[in-house]
Structures are given as structure tokens and as C-alpha cells.
Curated annotation (Swiss-Prot):
Enzymatic reactions: N(6)-[(R)-dihydrolipoyl]-L-lysyl-[protein] + succinyl-CoA = N(6)-[(R)-S(8)-succinyldihydrolipoyl]-L-lysyl-[protein] + CoA
Family named by the database record: Belongs to the 2-oxoacid dehydrogenase family.
Assigned keywords, A-Z: Acyltransferase, Lipoyl, Transferase, Tricarboxylic acid cycle
Record's keyword annotation contains rRNA-binding: no
Coiled coil (residue ranges): none
Co-factor remark: Binds 1 lipoyl cofactor covalently.
CDD domains linked to this entry: lipoyl_domain
Protein name: Dihydrolipoyllysine-residue succinyltransferase component of 2-oxoglutarate dehydrogenase complex
Length: 416
């Protein structure tokens, strides 16, 4: 008998532990090399653990919901066993297969709308399945990729939940709760995911550790919009990506950070660490919550490079494919609440960074130019900063530098 250990993959230095989500194989079942055995969740990403070798899954050491650390053994595979040897074990439950009706009854609670894993959510969207049409077998009823594949391949399974079609509004609720089934004054206690718990912890840490102050300014977006409208078609044809506004905000931020290095610095104990590089975090929404992937060396990136990377981050965040490396580090962050219609906000600093820029919705507003009232597309900028190391002067002038660069994009080319 040759036994191979299945171990938790390497986690980043900032991730101490992970949670086992859902085993896709049972002891005694045959596995192929690189076949996904389980998904584990860290406070940053969901990782898929593949089988290191082909064989038979002989022992599961860690169960769903268990907390594990990097390199910890979670299962063992017998590489000398064959699929044929595993067949008797798989055949044993055959009598249960003759009674599918109870299984359908058990699946009914899933109509409450189990939380779909990122990989499952993509498959469900492609197959036109709602959460109420898929029975979640993961922890706390979570819908796994295997659940989504099974539901998509079974036409009968799609037709069964038809009575639940009268409750489409439940799909707008993020919690996996069927409130209609809980009485007149419903409540449901749902445990936080590891990512949500980590977000809560870091936000509280930021509020309690940093001396947060926010400065505001308004920017006339007409010059950027005119430039974009003039070149957007040629830009997309040349670079294969649409010219958005975030690349201009990133460039304007880097422009200001070069002028005011303290905004790009961080505190380490009693020291101020000045970073000679510009790694810009871009806040991105995902099915699991807000994540902040990093644009490395943003000062060396073109507008096209930035737009391509942000688009890539959006797809990866939606599919749960962002790597730990992409989510680690950063010297400054940008949060764009404008995509949701936000007019104004006070963003919270992402530790250990010392500042964050909040971008909002661009709206036509009356402004005074040369004594005349004119209509201009205006955007309110908000920069929160750690007042422990950044004085008001640097913060205000830094935000003004961003404003000036956006109102005269030629400054970005001339480095003025």
C-alpha cells in the first residue's frame, strides 16, 4: 500500500488559517490526479485542493467546517488501489438509490436560497438556475460547484421547485433565508463567512488604530470625459479593452503620491516607512464580499495596462479566482462608490496603508466659471488619511494635486 498525503496548500504570510468547506469525495471513492477534492476558505480567497495523485481516497482526516493551517494533512490517498477496488464500497449504498423521493424532500430546504460558492454561482448563472433550484450540500447549505453541475445536468430537478417561483424577491436577499417560511416576524441567524469576519475585524482595527480624518474636493470631469469620448473607439480597437475612468483616477493618484510621499507611506511601530513603489489597491465587489486586489507598480503601467488589469480583477473576483498574491500588500487604495450611485462617502483606510481615495458618481451640476453659472459633470472626491503621520496640509494638497491632474490630463503626460 502506497499512501500519499493530501495537504492544505501554502497560504500567504498574512493568512494564518483556513476553513474546510465541502468534501467532493468520500472515503473509498476513486480519484484522478489533479481532481478537485475540496474547497477551503481563507479570509481572502476560496482555494481548490486537487488530488496530488490518482488512487482511492482512503482516509479523511479533517471534516467540513474544521479549521486548518498550511501544510496540514487533511486526507490520505492509496495510490496502489484502483477504481475497480473501490467499486464495492461505492456499490454498498445501492439500496438507498432506489428511494429518490426522500432525497427530493431533503432538498426542499435548499429552496430557501443557499449561498452559492463563487465557482457555483458562475455555473448557475450560465445555466439560468436560481439558488432555490439547487440543493446545497456544503457547510450550512452552501451550494458547491458539484451541486451546480448536478442541477444543470438534471432537467427534472429544474422543474421540481416550480411552486417556489412565486417568491422571486428572495433572490435579492443576500442571506440564505426563506422569510416567508419563518412566520410573521421572521429572524434567522447566519454565521459570517471567514471573509466577512475578516472584513469586520480589519474595519474595526482601522477605526480603533488610525486617527482617521477625511478631506473633500470636487473635480470637473469634462476634460477627462472629452478625452475619453474622442479616443475611446480607437483605444478599444488598439488595446482590446474599453477606456474607463478608473485608469485616470489611478494615474492621478500616483501623480499626487509622487509629490507627497507621506500619503504613500505607512506606520511600523514608531517608524514611518516610505515606499519607493506605488502599489494601488482597487476595491472590487465579489459574491463573497469586498476584496481589494493590487495594481503592482502602477506608476509603470499605461492606461491600457490598468484597464486590462482592473477588468481581469473584476472577472476573477466574480469567479472567486483571485490569488493570495493579488490580494496582499498595497500602499494606497481607491474605492469607487460611484458605480453604485454614491454621491459622497468617507472611506475607511485599509491597514497598514495610511490613506484611501473615495470616488463617487459624476453628475451634471451648476458651477461658477468666470462669473457665469454653467453646467459641468462634477465628481466629489474624498480622501481619508491617518492623521498620525499625514498632516492636513499634505492631505489637502495631495487631493488638490489629484483634482488638478484630472481637470488637466496633460499634466499626467508632462509630469507637472
Amino acid at each position: 500500500m502506497a499512501i500519499v498525503d493530501v495537504k492544505v496548500p501554502q497560504l500567504s504570510e498574512s493568512v494564518a488559517e483556513a476553513t474546510m468547506l465541502n468534501w467532493k469525495k468520500k472515503p473509498g471513492e476513486a480519484v484522478a490526479q489533479d481532481e478537485i477534492l475540496i474547497e477551503i476558505e481563507t479570509d481572502k480567497v476560496v482555494l481548490e485542493v486537487p488530488a496530488p495523485s490518482a488512487g482511492v481516497l482512503s482516509i479523511i482526516v479533517k471534516n467540513d467546517g474544521d479549521t486548518v493551517v498550511a501544510d496540514e494533512i487533511i486526507a490520505k490517498i492509496d495510490t496502489e488501489a484502483t477504481a475497480g477496488a473501490a467499486a464495492p464500497a461505492a456499490a454498498a449504498p445501492a439500496p438507498a438509490a432506489a428511494a429518490p423521493a426522500p432525497a427530493a424532500a431533503v432538498a426542499a430546504p435548499a429552496a430557501a436560497g443557499g449561498v452559492a460558492m463563487p465557482s457555483a454561482a458562475k455555473l448557475m448563472a450560465e445555466a439560468g438556475l436560481s439558488a432555490g433550484q439547487v440543493a446545497g450540500t456544503g457547510k450550512d447549505g452552501r451550494i458547491t460547484k458539484g451541486d451546480a453541475l448536478a442541477a444543470a445536468a438534471a432537467p427534472a430537478a429544474k422543474a421540481a421547485p416550480a411552486p417556489a417561483a412565486a417568491k422571486p424577491a428572495l433572490q435579492q436577499v443576500s442571506a440564505p433565508v426563506d422569510f416567508a417560511a419563518l412566520g410573521d416576524r421572521p429572524e434567522e441567524r447566519v454565521p459570517m463567512s471567514r471573509l466577512r469576519a475578516r472584513i469586520a475585524e480589519r474595519l474595526l482595527q482601522s477605526q480603533s488604530t488610525n486617527a482617521i480624518l477625511t478631506t473633500f474636493n470636487e473635480v470637473n470631469m469634462k476634460p477627462v470625459m472629452d478625452l475619453r469620448n474622442k479616443y475611446k473607439d480607437r483605444f478599444e480597437k488598439e488595446h482590446g479593452v474599453k477606456l474607463g475612468f478608473m485608469s485616470f483616477f489611478v494615474k492621478a493618484a500616483v501623480h499626487a503620491l509622487k509629490k507627497f510621499p507621506l500619503i504613500n507611506a505607512s506606520i511600523d511601530g514608531n517608524d514611518i516607512v516610505y515606499h519607493g513603489y506605488f502599489d494601488i489597491g482597487i476595491a472590487v465587489g465579489s459574491p463573497r464580499g469586498l476584496v481589494v486586489p493590487i495594481l503592482r507598480n502602477a506608476d509603470q503601467m499605461s492606461l491600457a495596462d490598468i484597464e486590462k488589469k482592473i477588468a481581469e480583477f473584476g472577472v476573477k473576483a466574480r469567479d472567486g479566482k483571485l490569488s493570495l498574491e493579488e490580494l496582499t500588500g498595497g500602499t494606497f487604495s481607491i474605492s469607487n462608490g460611484g458605480v453604485f450611485g454614491s454621491m459622497l462617502s468617507t472611506p475607511i483606510i485599509n491597514p497598514p496603508q495610511s490613506a484611501i481615495l473615495g470616488v463617487h458618481a459624476t453628475k451634471d451640476r451648476p458651477v461658477v466659471e468666470d462669473g457665469q453659472i454653467v453646467i459641468r459633470p462634477m465628481n466629489y472626491l474624498a480622501m481619508s488619511y491617518d492623521h498620525r503621520i499625514i498632516d492636513g496640509r499634505e492631505a489637502v494638497l495631495g487631493l488638490v494635486a489629484m483634482k488638478d491632474a484630472l481637470e488637466d490630463p496633460a499634466r499626467l503626460l508632462l509630469d507637472l
